[in-house]
């Protein structure tokens, strides 16, 4: 759990910096995390801990690189229409006997918009943070969750 969700981000950031970003003194590092890194969720403690760790890494590294033109941010999607969400819905159905509609309703209940996040909404947030107009945004954990957080 920690290797996939925390160590991999650390190593990726480390490699990006070593591959020339640090020498150039400019660039964008963006981690895709989860709202679990902002608030946590029951029954996924290790996952939430790893995601909290990525946000801590993001904030600390942003401070270390603040005097360069390298920004470090995290995007924290809520429940997003992906295969991972499909597995979560199936898991709820299997463990609780709820219908698909009930399982989906349970997951969207925390989203004030009452829906799942679309993958392209997450991608657009990442693209903005990688773009030329985001130079003063660093050390942030941007929630893309329909107002959940």
How should each PLM-predicted stretch be described?
Residues 1-11, 30, 54:
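Catalytic Tyr-X3-Lys loop
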Residues 13, 50, 58:
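Active-site helix of classical SDR
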Residues 18-19, 63-64, 135:
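Alpha-helical segment proximal to the catalytic Tyr-Lys
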Residues 34:
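Residue(s) in the substrate-gating loop at a strand-loop-helix junction
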Residues 39-45, 67-68, 114, 132:
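Active-site loop immediately N-terminal to the catalytic Tyr-X3-Lys motif
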Residues 40-48, 60, 88:
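Active-site loop-to-helix junction immediately N-terminal to the catalytic Tyr of the SDR YXXXK motif
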Residues 66, 71, 137-139:
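Short, small/polar-rich loop/turn modules that mediate ligand/substrate recognition or access, typified
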Residues 113-144:
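C-terminal substrate-recognition "lid" of short-chain dehydrogenase/reductases
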């Amino acid at each position: 759990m920690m290797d996939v969700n925390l160590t991999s981000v650390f190593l990726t950031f480390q490699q990006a910096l070593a591959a020339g970003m640090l020498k150039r003194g400019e660039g964008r590092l963006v981690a895709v995390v989860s709202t679990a890194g902002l608030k946590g969720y029951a029954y996924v403690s290790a996952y939430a801990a790893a995601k909290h760790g990525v946000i801590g890494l993001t904030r600390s590294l942003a401070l270390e690189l603040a005097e360069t033109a390298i920004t470090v941010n995290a995007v924290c999607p809520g429940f997003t229409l992906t295969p991972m969400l499909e597995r979560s819905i199936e898991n709820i159905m299997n463990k609780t006997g709820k219908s698909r509609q009930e399982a989906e309703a349970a997951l969207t209940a925390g989203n004030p918009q009452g829906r799942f996040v679309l993958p392209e909404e997450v991608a657009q947030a990442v693209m903005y943070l990688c773009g030329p107009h985001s130079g003063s945004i660093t050390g942030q954990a941007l929630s893309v969750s329909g107002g959940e957080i």
